[in-house]
């Protein structure tokens, strides 16, 4: 096979759900283009969670994991799995020893901030409690700045997570000093006012004060405020960060920590910056932040983007703000700089409080740009991400999710019709994980806002090869399939297999 171009459309959070479920936003929306391509073009299903994507067995997938597996053509051991394995001997880590030594010398307090959640997408609470306990054993006072989840977990699971966390730190000089919903603490869409609200609570204890974490959470629940949206709050007599203190950023996923880390380091326009002695992060967040980390990044060679570049071919990555990092940084397996002949287009996400208020997000603007680029026939590989199914799925709003599905479906029809105009072009429609196909948790009688364990679709429209047969596989099989379609030899590093039978 020697097609001239491949358009890879990643419908973020669009999984294979139960077709007749009243909680499946896809089937309930009756998207016409989707129904047509599902019935008329070659299709298979891909595993997007657990050990098939380098996560612990039974762990939900996510966008970072999904995009890395898609581009690398191999199962990538993920941060959660790696840290689970290595944190048992973390006291031998050179950067941690240096961090502890500095705190001891200055008699400083260790400020650990991160998502206290068992979701395993951005962090894991057991990693945070392990670090806190190990540092506390050096007779260092530890305070926790707890971010609450409710997005990769059930909306009201924060209380249980905090209870378990406090049980695990009991007996050491460790306490929770501030609490903040991730909506504020972990913004990645340049809503700096949210990040600043969290920062001011952490740095200066400038926020509403509450005496007890559990009663704070209960009060919010009673007012129908779920974990994600709890406003930054100071607990007890916490006074803020001092010059002698150290800061440890405990989330292992980078994209939702960059804004907070940037303010902490004075790398934004925000001028009131608290001084501290040392800083450490769980993983590398961003090159220009220059924060020492506990777990340096793994390096990958012969990823899909690299192979396209090495063959002197052009490629395009396009997404709106919420998923831009996924089609660039994560799709390049942690490489920030574009490859040679790699063009990137960022479409701003709408400035709304939550995306159920504008479920179409910026999909139509993205599609207008995408269609023009397909018609230009400049690119051998185009990677596009539609954020709507995931971002609106996370709100738990079924009606909005159906609107998001229909908006993406309308865009997909435009993309398909454009690809049909081009000779020797292929359209692949797939997803990185599930979400929008399950909008309610009957067991817990609550909206389902997290990702799912469902497989994801893989549909291919080849302009001149309608008898193509596909086999089921996993996300790491996508890159080898694309290379086969382009007539490019798969490198040895890609252990995935082409889905084409």
From Swiss-Prot:
Family: Belongs to the BPG-independent phosphoglycerate mutase family.
Pfam families hit by this protein: iPGM_N (PF06415), Metalloenzyme (PF01676)
UniProt-recorded name of the protein: 2,3-bisphosphoglycerate-independent phosphoglycerate mutase
Cofactors required: Mn(2+)
E.C. no: 5.4.2.12
Residue positions binding Mn(2+) 1: 390, 394, 451
Binding-site residues, Mn(2+) 2: 12, 63, 432-433
Keywords, alphabetical: Glycolysis, Isomerase, Manganese, Metal-binding
Gene that encodes it: gpmI
Organism, scientific name: Wolbachia sp. subsp. Brugia malayi (strain TRS)
Catalytically driven reaction(s): (2R)-2-phosphoglycerate = (2R)-3-phosphoglycerate
């Amino acid at each position: 096979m020697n097609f001239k171009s491949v358009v890879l459309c990643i419908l973020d959070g669009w999984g294979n759900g139960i077709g007749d479920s009243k909680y499946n936003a896809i089937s309930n929306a009756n998207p016409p283009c989707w129904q047509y391509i599902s019935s008329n073009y070659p299709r298979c299903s891909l595993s997007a969670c657990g050990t098939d994507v380098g996560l612990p067995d039974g762990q939900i997938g996510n966008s970072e994991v999904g995009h890395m597996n898609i581009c690398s053509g191999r199962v990538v051991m993920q941060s959660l799995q790696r840290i689970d394995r290595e944190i048992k001997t973390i006291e031998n880590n050179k950067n941690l020893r240096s961090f502890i030594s500095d705190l001891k010398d200055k008699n400083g307090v260790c400020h650990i901030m991160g998502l206290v959640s068992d979701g395993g997408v951005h962090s894991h609470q057991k990693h945070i409690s392990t670090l806190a306990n190990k540092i506390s054993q050096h007779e260092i006072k530890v305070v926790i700045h707890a971010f609450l989840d409710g997005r990769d977990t059930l909306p009201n699971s924060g209380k249980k997570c905090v209870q378990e966390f406090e049980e695990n730190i009991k007996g050491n000089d460790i306490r929770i000093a501030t609490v903040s919903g991730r909506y504020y603490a972990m913004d990645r869409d340049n809503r700096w006012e949210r990040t600043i609200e969290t920062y001011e609570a952490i740095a200066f204890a400038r926020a509403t004060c509450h005496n007890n974490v559990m009663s704070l959470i209960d009060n919010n629940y009673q007012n129908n405020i779920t974990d994600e949206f709890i406003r930054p709050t100071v607990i007890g007599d916490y006074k803020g960060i001092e010059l002698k203190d150290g800061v440890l950023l405990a989330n292992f996923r980078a994209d939702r920590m960059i804004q907070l880390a940037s303010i902490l380091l004075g790398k934004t326009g925000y001028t009131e910056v608290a001084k501290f002695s040392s800083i450490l992060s769980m993983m590398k967040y961003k090159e220009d932040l220059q924060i020492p980390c506990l777990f340096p990044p793994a390096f990958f060679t012969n990823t899909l983007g690299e192979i396209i570049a090495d063959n002197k071919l052009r490629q395009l990555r396009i997404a709106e703000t919420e998923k831009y990092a996924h089609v660039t940084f994560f799709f390049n397996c942690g490489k920030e700089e574009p490859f040679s002949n790699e063009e990137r287009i960022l479409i701003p996400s709408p400035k709304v409080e939550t995306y159920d208020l504008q479920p179409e997000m910026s999909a139509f603007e993205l599609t207008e740009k995408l269609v023009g680029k397909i018609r230009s026939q400049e690119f051998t590989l185009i990677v596009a991400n539609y954020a709507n199914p995931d971002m609106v799925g996370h709100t738990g709003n079924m009606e909005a999710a159906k609107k998001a599905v229909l908006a993406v479906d309308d865009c997909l029809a435009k993309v398909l019709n454009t690809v049909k105009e081009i000779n020797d072009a292929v359209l692949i429609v797939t997803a990185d994980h599930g979400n929008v196909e399950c909008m309610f948790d009957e067991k817990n009688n609550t909206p389902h806002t997290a990702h799912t364990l469902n497989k994801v679709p893989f549909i291919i429209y080849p302009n001149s090869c309608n008898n193509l047969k596909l086999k089921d596989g996993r996300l790491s099989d996508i890159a080898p399939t694309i290379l086969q379609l382009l007539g490019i030899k798969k490198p040895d590093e890609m252990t995935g297999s082409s889905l084409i039978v």
